[in-house]
């Protein structure tokens, strides 16, 4: 059963909530800077050459490490979402209210945009790569791929961080979350790019001015995240009472 709570504006503007938004902004900025920065660095080192297997592995590792750190540094303040799909998935399970979740989205997207602007500045105008489906694939395939890989990510978040029965698993949550993102980039990178994160795709799209495929990276991840929240929250957590987002330690 969906456990969505709307919440109140007052609670969403409390001191602790404002700190959570700032935490999401900073952590997402650092994650996107390192993740997108690894792709920019690859382009620099290869003179804008095509992505090869070694480059894919390097970019996947960079994203995995950066997300591990980002989740770790934000966990005790905001829950360490760094991703609108994660926020939506947790909202489906009643772990965060819709109003507060909406401001999380804003903070995450702003963090991504600022990270990309900083990358353009510090690289002397190098372009930031955007997500897009590969040649020969259609938008539908891209959306389905993003649904699957984002489902895996948010399911992992639930299992290791949000489930009240997690026990000692909570201590390895950031590692598990980083690992699943790295693995999914290796699997989906050559096809959809393996975004799993609307904010991660939104920043480069806005800064580059290429919004032609951005809808794929909102629809796919949000559907995947919502499905994971619905299935894990309803089937496996069941009658457990929902906890507040900042009580979820990853």
UniProtKB/Swiss-Prot annotation:
Query: What job does this protein perform?
Result: Transports methylammonium or ammonium in yeast cells, preferentially at high medium pH. May participate in vacuolar compartmentation and detoxification of ammonium.
Question: Per its UniProt record, what InterPro entries does this chain match?
Answer: Aquaporin-like (IPR023271), Aquaporin_transptr (IPR034294), MIP (IPR000425), MIP_CS (IPR022357)
Location of the motif NPA 2: 197-199
The portions of this protein that span the membrane are 25-45, 55-75, 102-122, 135-155, 169-189, 218-238
Tissues where the protein occurs: Widely expressed.
Give the domain note. Answer: Aquaporins contain two tandem repeats each containing three membrane-spanning domains and a pore-forming loop with the signature motif Asn-Pro-Ala (NPA).
Regions of this protein lying in the Cytoplasmic compartment = 1-24, 76-101, 156-168, 239-250
Chief location of this protein within or outside the cell: membrane
Keywords in UniProt for this one?
Acetylation, Membrane, Methylation, Repeat, Transmembrane, Transmembrane helix, Transport, Vacuole
- Its gene name is TIP2-3
One GO cellular component term noted in the UniProt record for this chain: plant-type vacuole membrane
Q: Which residues form a coiled coil?
A: none
Q: Which Pfam families match?
A: MIP
Subcellular location per UniProt equals: Vacuole membrane
Question: What does the UniProt induction comment state?
Answer: By ammonium nitrate in roots. Expressed in roots with a circadian rhythm showing an increase after onset of light, a peak approximately at midday and a decline to lowest levels before offset of light.
- Family annotation (NCBIfam families): MIP
- Residue intervals annotated with topology Vacuolar: 46-54, 123-134, 190-217
Question: Whom does it interact with, and what assembly results?
Answer: Interacts with cucumber mosaic virus (CMV) Protein 1a.
Q: What is this protein called?
A: Aquaporin TIP2-3
- Return the motif ranges for NPA 1: 83-85
What membrane topology is annotated for this entry?
Multi-pass membrane protein
């Amino acid at each position: 059963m969906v456990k969505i709570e709307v919440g109140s504006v007052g609670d969403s503007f409390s001191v602790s909530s404002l700190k959570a938004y700032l935490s999401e902004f900073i952590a997402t900025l650092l994650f996107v800077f390192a993740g997108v920065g690894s792709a920019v660095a690859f382009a620099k080192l290869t003179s804008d050459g095509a992505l090869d297997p070694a480059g894919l592995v390097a970019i996947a590792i960079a994203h995995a490490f950066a997300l591990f750190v980002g989740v770790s540094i934000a966990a005790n303040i905001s829950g360490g979402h760094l991703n609108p799909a994660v926020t939506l998935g947790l909202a489906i399970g009643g772990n965060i209210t819709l109003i507060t979740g909406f401001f999380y989205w804003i903070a995450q997207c702003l963090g991504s945009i600022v990270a990309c602007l900083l990358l353009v500045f510090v690289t002397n105008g190098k372009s930031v790569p955007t997500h897009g489906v590969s040649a020969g694939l259609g938008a539908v395939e891209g959306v389905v791929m993003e649904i699957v890989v984002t489902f895996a990510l948010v399911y992992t978040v639930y299992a290791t961080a949000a489930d009240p029965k997690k026990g000692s698993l909570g201590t390895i949550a950031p590692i598990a979350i980083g690992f699943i993102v790295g693995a999914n980039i290796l699997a989906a990178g050559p096809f959809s790019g393996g975004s799993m994160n609307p904010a991660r795709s939104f920043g480069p799209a806005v800064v580059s001015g290429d919004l032609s495929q951005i809808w794929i990276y909102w629809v796919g991840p949000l559907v995947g995240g919502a499905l994971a929240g619905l299935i894990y929250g309803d089937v496996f957590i069941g009658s457990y009472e929902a906890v507040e987002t900042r009580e979820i330690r990853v």
